[in-house]
């Protein structure tokens, strides 16, 4: 029974900590809204550029290729994280873990080859059109 009492005391401590964090956040937000400036005007809504007049628009149109590269980076980066976790425990996982890692790497390589074949990694639109025409033949 003493273990349950210790566990209960630990949980109460965590609950008090969470209440303290929420209370502190609410206090800081409340004080900043009460003491902060409330002046609204045309100049308040403009972006601040170190005292210089703004030049150009703030919205830049980026090509969809950049988003594709970012998504591919995130996907392969997370997969590399899984491989790193496997490499830390390679001795404990034995041969079955090694075979599973090889299957995982093979799936990664198959996905990379597929992306290359479809043309997702091509920057030039002409090369993509040529590759898709070859695939259709």
From Swiss-Prot:
Keyword match Hydrolase: no
Reactions listed under catalytic activity: a quinone + NADH + 5 H(+)(in) = a quinol + NAD(+) + 4 H(+)(out)
GO molecular function, one term: quinone binding
EC assignment: 7.1.1.-
The entry's keywords: Cell inner membrane, Cell membrane, Membrane, NAD, Quinone, Translocase, Transmembrane, Transmembrane helix, Transport, Ubiquinone
Membrane spanning stretches: 12-32, 66-86, 96-116
Location(s), subcellular: Cell inner membrane
Superkingdom in the source lineage: Bacteria
InterPro entries: NAD(P)H_OxRDtase_bac/plastid, NADH_UbQ/plastoQ_OxRdtase_su3, NDAH_ubi_oxred_su3_sf
GO CC field: NADH dehydrogenase complex; plasma membrane
Primary subcellular site in the record, as a coarse category: membrane
Pfam families: Oxidored_q4
Membrane topology qualifier: Multi-pass membrane protein
Family: Belongs to the complex I subunit 3 family.
Known partners and oligomeric status: NDH-1 is composed of 13 different subunits. Subunits NuoA, H, J, K, L, M, N constitute the membrane sector of the complex.
Function: NDH-1 shuttles electrons from NADH, via FMN and iron-sulfur (Fe-S) centers, to quinones in the respiratory chain. The immediate electron acceptor for the enzyme in this species is believed to be ubiquinone. Couples the redox reaction to proton translocation (for every two electrons transferred, four hydrogen ions are translocated across the cytoplasmic membrane), and thus conserves the redox energy in a proton gradient.
PANTHER family: NADH-QUINONE OXIDOREDUCTASE SUBUNIT A, NADH-UBIQUINONE OXIDOREDUCTASE CHAIN 3
Protein name (database record): NADH-quinone oxidoreductase subunit A
């Amino acid at each position: 029974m003493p273990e349950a009492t210790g566990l209960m005391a630990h949980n109460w401590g965590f609950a008090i900590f969470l209440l303290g964090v929420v209370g502190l956040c609410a206090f800081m937000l409340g004080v900043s809204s009460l003491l902060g400036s409330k002046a609204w005007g045309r100049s308040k809504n403009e972006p601040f550029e170190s005292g210089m007049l703004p030049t150009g628009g703030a919205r830049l149109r980026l090509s969809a290729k950049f988003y594709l590269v970012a998504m591919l980076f995130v996907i392969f980066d997370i997969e590399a994280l899984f491989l790193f976790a496997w490499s830390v425990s390679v001795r404990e996982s034995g041969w079955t873990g090694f075979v599973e890692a090889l299957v995982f790497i093979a799936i990664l390589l198959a996905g990379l080859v597929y992306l290359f074949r479809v043309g997702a990694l091509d920057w030039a639109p002409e090369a993509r059109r040529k590759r898709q025409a070859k695939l259709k033949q």
